[in-house]
């Protein structure tokens, strides 16, 4: 599994103008978590170079700033979720994913929770990667930086509530 997809690999088209060939970072930013029973490793991926300017790497830049589940024995990607499209703010995932067993609507669920620098907690089914609660793609302001094209939307989890205040005062 390549955290920056190479030519012909899934997600390479999200790195426009061949930027996958010369962009760096997009590494495992912090500690991974593993589920021995499922044979899966959950990897919190960092921000690509340059953290605050993406004009040289247009596109959503999959798998940057994503939680990626891979098979422990092969490294094959099983599922992923990108928490920031075309990161411009150094919002890489700051902590190891937390493996939790929860009950949702009366049914037990193996889940993985991933916190973000924005104060969000994203919660997914550990096996399928499906969000436990809806995650909305919301419109966000465009960039005014010359050469930069920010993503028109970003994902916002609806539950649990953010653990940090949202907005600018």
Sequence positions of predicted segments:
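Noncatalytic, solvent-exposed loop/strand surfaces
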Residues: 1-169
């Amino acid at each position: 599994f390549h955290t920056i997809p190479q030519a012909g690999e899934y997600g390479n088209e999200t790195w426009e103008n061949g930027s996958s060939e010369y962009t760096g970072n997009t590494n495992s930013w912090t500690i991974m978590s593993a589920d021995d029973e499922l044979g899966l490793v959950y990897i919190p991926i960092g921000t690509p170079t340059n953290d605050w300017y993406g004009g040289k790497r247009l596109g959503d830049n999959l798998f940057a700033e994503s939680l990626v589940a891979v098979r422990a024995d092969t490294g094959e990607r099983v599922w992923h979720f990108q928490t920031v499209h075309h990161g411009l703010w150094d919002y890489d995932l700051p902590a190891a994913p937390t493996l939790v067993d929860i009950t949702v609507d009366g049914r037990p669920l193996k889940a993985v929770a991933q916190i973000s620098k924005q104060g969000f907690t994203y919660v997914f089914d550990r096996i399928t990667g499906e969000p436990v609660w809806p995650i909305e793609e919301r419109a966000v302001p465009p960039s005014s930086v010359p050469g930069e094209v920010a993503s028109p939307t970003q994902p916002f989890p609806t539950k649990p509530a953010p653990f940090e205040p949202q907005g600018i005062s």
